[in-house]
Amino acid sequence: MTQAVAARRDGDAFQARIFWRKAACLLDPKSPVTQVGFESGPKGFDDVWVAYAPDRAPNDHEGRPILREHIQCKWHVSVNDFGHADLIEPEWINANRISLLQRARAAQVAHARDGFGARFKLLTNWRIGQTDPLRGYINQKSKTLRLK
């Protein structure tokens, strides 16, 4: 039971740090951040969200502006890694039927149908396994998933 309590507490602290790190940008008049929120947004990517000014928004890996970023924070108390199989297993996110990858797809269709303007990010203290095939699909510069 104490392991579960520690995981919950540490996970909440991790999410809060991400939120406040983004929210602090609101104090900088030169920051592209215009709004920050938490616990709202597309299911599975609702821990923290950030809205950016269109004229100062960060660009995606293809140079297009990202107007909104949805972040899912995944904290683990144990040291480990993850891989492609975890992204399609609902149990990995403590769900019954829908995996993180399915939730990412649903969020993309609902919030950025053409694939532009929104980013859906998984932030975790685990790394992708050294030998996992998923590693080869990650752009090392932008840390994005290459689908082509």
Task: Give a label for each model feature.
Residues 8-88:
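Catalytic centers of nucleases
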